[in-house]
């Protein structure tokens, strides 16, 4: 029993989003981009901070210029854009806008991005979990449909490509998504769009109950700045802007995103390198005895090793200097630089000998 009687009892069992348990020389656990911004970009941003951003003034609360820049990049209109302190804030706002007051729960197909369930639970929103196919990690559409019949689902949460497994939605899954009733909000999380190059954005006009989430933390290398954006129906974006906390993005973060979009071609050129490294890692992992690795459309690979407890393998790898993430009963390895990937493979071979 909790000594703090004012606390909600259900929150006592809520586990926070966890990262790698200890520092590692090579951080391949968080799906970050392995290359920092070019020095010239960072110097320009530093100069902006020094000369152009008054510390005593609040930042732009409405993100007007940023919405225009993002809309131009994404192929949308500014009124279709809402910005958050990372996609996490947007997810939380979407759940507040749809599910609070006993209006329904969310459907998640696991394994998937854990923050959907964590944020829903923190708000007292029911979470209905449906397991994915254990071989392909495809959605079990029959069980998803059963969940819709048996529970008052208000939001369906889909990550495309999925994290941690890396697979994109299939044609059959898209057909199911397109058939969902308009009273159900469909969150299509495209955090890894720049790697997969697949987007549902062209179909948004046909589906006012769809909303796309993206982030600048991955391919644009701005994880430290925590900026995500939603693309959807203007009325939904207006509600999200009303729900979010005021001044949710720092002035420096807004300038960083503006710079990233101005130099998008240069920054995104290195995505090709990551995809090439991903395929090389995939082939190398396939050749190791006992390793089952799944193909990926993102900047990470998901795998399991026969005869090994994945958490024990994570710890052994960590001790040798490579941080990986344990999730969903397996390990997720972020694609790093060629040197980081080489060291990761060497260390794994050493462990498996």
Swiss-Prot record:
Signal sequence annotation: none
Catalytic activity field: L-histidinol phosphate + 2-oxoglutarate = 3-(imidazol-4-yl)-2-oxopropyl phosphate + L-glutamate
Keywords: Amino-acid biosynthesis, Aminotransferase, Histidine biosynthesis, Pyridoxal phosphate, Transferase
One record GO biological process: L-histidine biosynthetic process
Entry keyword annotation includes Amino-acid biosynthesis: yes
Entry GO MF terms: histidinol-phosphate transaminase activity; pyridoxal phosphate binding
Residues recorded with modification N6-(pyridoxal phosphate)lysine: 218
Disulfide bridge map: none
Listed EC numbers: 2.6.1.9
Pathway info: Amino-acid biosynthesis; L-histidine biosynthesis; L-histidine from 5-phospho-alpha-D-ribose 1-diphosphate: step 7/9
Any Pfam family hit: Aminotran_1_2
Reported cofactor(s): pyridoxal 5'-phosphate
SUPFAM superfamilies for this protein: PLP-dependent transferases
InterPro entries: Aminotransferase_I/II_large, HisP_aminotrans, HistidinolP_aminotransfase, PyrdxlP-dep_Trfase, PyrdxlP-dep_Trfase_major, PyrdxlP-dep_Trfase_small
Family from the record: Belongs to the class-II pyridoxal-phosphate-dependent aminotransferase family. Histidinol-phosphate aminotransferase subfamily.
Assembly behavior: Homodimer.
Protein name (Swiss-Prot/TrEMBL): Histidinol-phosphate aminotransferase
Gene this protein is translated from: hisC
